[in-house]
UniProtKB/Swiss-Prot annotation:
Quaternary structure and partners: Homodimer.
Family indicated by similarity: Belongs to the transketolase family. DXPS subfamily.
Protein name, entry field: 1-deoxy-D-xylulose-5-phosphate synthase
Binding of thiamine diphosphate, residues: H72, G113, H114, A115, G145, A146, N173, Y281, E360
Disulfide bonds listed in the record: none
Top EC class of this enzyme: transferase
Record keywords, A-Z: Isoprene biosynthesis, Magnesium, Metal-binding, Thiamine biosynthesis, Thiamine pyrophosphate, Transferase
Stored CDD domains: TPP_DXS, TPP_PYR_DXS_TK_like
Length: 615
């Protein structure tokens, strides 16, 4: 295999074009093989193989800095930069990351995971390069979905102004995770249509030149005038950025030729490359949304694998039903229709649904505008992405106490996506915001109760739930819930475990049937149930949460006890002050000591040794 001979990008420069083409197919096979075992971002990486090979053929990594926005498309990059022997560990605990990571390889120019960051990073690098008198190339590879993000557009504005030498490669596959939305995406599609027209034009030009040179001259002058107008309306020219394209992102020879030419140019240049998401794997080409990030599968007989009924689906089903009951309900999402379980809702209530693209801040402030005019908006968003709209949560929603509901998906440890995606900071940054209430349901039925009640209580409410399966709740059932009140699930005589969110099941498992240990579903963090907390202060208390210990649920409990002048023995279980890498969720919980075994050990340290500990 040719891949066996490739240990660094330098080895690509010694291969013939024919060998590079064969290497592209070998890389695709390896990506399919490993993602079939481990899961991962399959379709994006398959679509970028030729582009990655061309970039490493022309540029000199790691001296030249090649940045991959988000990192979904970087698997080929990992394979040709000295990590092929570890590629089988992709996204596994102790293995290589599914994204680019500075600490993993000198060839990874940035640590990525969130969208739209590459251009600002690249701008910083070219500024540093020029100020330090160094000479290297900076190339930012960004998808058409990520380019719609406000951070990317703001960086383009500054890149055009400063006119520093850098190359932006727009990898246009018409997708992010869901289908792309917005005016810029429509423009990219129009450019692709124009490319088809240009190809037809070339054929007509050859025929016309032979038939009538005079007529050809007239048509050619008209074409030049049209080209001028096209450039005038091209947004990249308006930014002061040279635009080249669109070009075929799977024409390896053509890509190498174009990149060699662009490498010599001064100022900022954008190369528009059109690729096919899932290229070379029929099922991924046919359904790039599902195969964007599939779980494990059989590569010889690839079929969609049911992930079971998830919290995301439970949320989607609940809001779909609620929208039939509440005509003012409106749901927004930042490019996560499928991930947030909103396909059904978007089909049944298209007029009250908005995908704003990868613009979390826009989602939150648009929700504020809706609320100001009498609507009841719900922002469906992952915990890790809500942090990108923190200012809007405070400035646009909370200050005026607007009735916006934040449905926070993927709260807590999320597994194989690692440090950039764990939702373990939202409690800390949200509970400091006045007016904002925070809750976490124990099951899908309680989620339904909280969503319905949240639309009635007034003011902003955050409801957080994990990346996990959950038992389906019956349709049409909307139980009442005592807002702000906790729920005792098991009585105890010596100690109580106060569990918030997903850790409740660990608490019940740890307590078992031991009569000394009680368990509380502490489902409301803000407001805390101070009445119950006062009653429980006669016992030893152990708080448990799938969140950073600092500033989390346990901290809120201690603050409340202090304000009430109560001093029971309290221990807090949560994530320690460090970033957790990728791995299986149960394993990461075990590392953090918030699983059932960790709870039993903490209780034993408090003098309540359970049967498990005594044995």
């Amino acid at each position: 295999m040719i891949l066996d001979k490739v240990n660094s990008p330098e080895d690509l420069k010694r291969l013939s074009l024919e060998e590079l083409l064969l290497l592209a197919e070998e890389i695709r096979s390896e990506i399919i093989r490993v993602t079939a075992q481990n899961g991962g971002h399959l379709a994006s990486s398959l679509g970028a193989v030729e582009l990655v090979l061309a970039l490493h053929r022309v540029f000199d990594s790691p001296r030249d800095r090649i940045l991959f926005d988000v990192g979904h498309q970087a698997y080929a990059h990992k394979l040709v930069t000295g990590r092929k022997d570890r590629f089988h560990t992709l996204r596994k605990e102790g293995g290589i990351s599914g994204f680019t990571k500075v600490s993993e390889s000198p060839h990874d120019a940035i640590t990525a995971g969130h969208a739209s960051t590459s251009l600002a990073n690249a701008l910083g690098m070219v500024l540093a390069r020029d100020l330090m008198g160094e000479d290297y190339h900076v190339v930012a590879v960004i998808g058409d979905g990520a380019l719609t993000g406000g951070m990317a557009l703001a960086a383009l504005n500054k890149i055009g102004e400063l006119q520093k030498r850098m190359l932006i490669v727009l990898n246009d596959n018409e997708m992010s995770i869901s289908e792309n939305v917005g005016a810029l995406n429509k423009y990219f599609k129009e450019l692709q249509i124009r490319k088809w027209v240009q190809d037809a034009e070339k054929l007509g030009k050859n025929i016309l030149e032979r038939i009538s040179p005079q007529l050809f001259g007239l048509v050619d002058r008209a074409k030049e005038a049209a080209k001028f107008l096209l450039h005038q309306e091209n947004p990249f020219y308006a930014w002061g950025i040279r635009y080249v394209g669109p070009v075929d992102g799977h024409d390896l020879k053509g890509l190498v030729h174009i990149l060699e030419h662009l490498k010599a140019l001064d100022g900022p240049t954008l190369l528009h490359v059109v690729t096919k998401k899932g290229k070379g794997y029929k099922v991924a080409e046919a359904d790039p949304i599902y195969w964007h990030g599939p779980p494990g599968f059989d590569p010889k007989k690839p079929e969609k694998v049911s992930k079971g009924y998830t919290w995301s689906q439970a949320f989607g089903d609940a809001v779909t039903e609620l929208a039939h009951m509440e005509p003012r309900l409106f749901v927004l999402t930042p490019a996560m229709r499928e991930g947030s379980g909103l396909v059904r809702y978007s089909l049944e209530h298209p007029e009250r649904y908005l995908d704003v693209g990868i613009c979390e801040d826009v989602a939150v402030t648009t929700a504020a505008g809706l609320a100001l005019r009498g609507m009841k908006p719900i922002v469906a968003i992952y915990s890790t992405f809500l942090q990108r709209a923190y200012d809007q949560v405070i400035h646009d929603v909370a200050i005026e106490n607007l009735p916006v509901v934040f449905a926070i998906d993927r709260a807590g440890i999320v597994g194989a996506d690692g440090a950039t995606h764990h939702g373990v900071f939202d409690i800390a940054y949200l509970r400091t915001v006045p007016n904002l209430q925070i809750a976490a349901p124990k099951d899908a039925l309680e989620l339904r109760a909280m969503l319905k009640k949240a639309l009635e209580v007034g003011g902003p409410v955050a409801i957080r739930y994990p990346r996990d399966n959950v038992e389906r709740a019956p349709e049409g059932v909307w139980p009442e819930i005592a807002w702000g009140k906790w729920e005792v699930l098991k009585e105890g005589t010596e100690a109580y475990i106060l569990a918030f969110g997903k850790t409740l099941r660990y608490a019940l498992e740890a307590a078992g049937d031991d009569p000394r240990v009680g368990v509380v579903n502490a489902r409301f963090l803000k407001p805390l149930d101070r009445e119950m907390l006062r009653e429980l202060s006669r016992y030893k208390l152990l708080t448990v949460e799938d969140h950073q210990k600092m500033g989390g649920f346990g901290s809120a409990v201690l603050e409340a006890l202090n304000e009430m002048g109560l001093k029971p023995e309290v221990q807090i279980l949560g994530l320690p002050d460090r970033f957790f890498e990728h791995g299986a969720i149960p394993s990461l919980h075990r590392q953090a000591g918030i699983d059932a075994e960790g709870i039993r050990k903490a209780l034993a340290a408090m003098g309540v040794a359970l049967v498990h500990e005594r044995a």
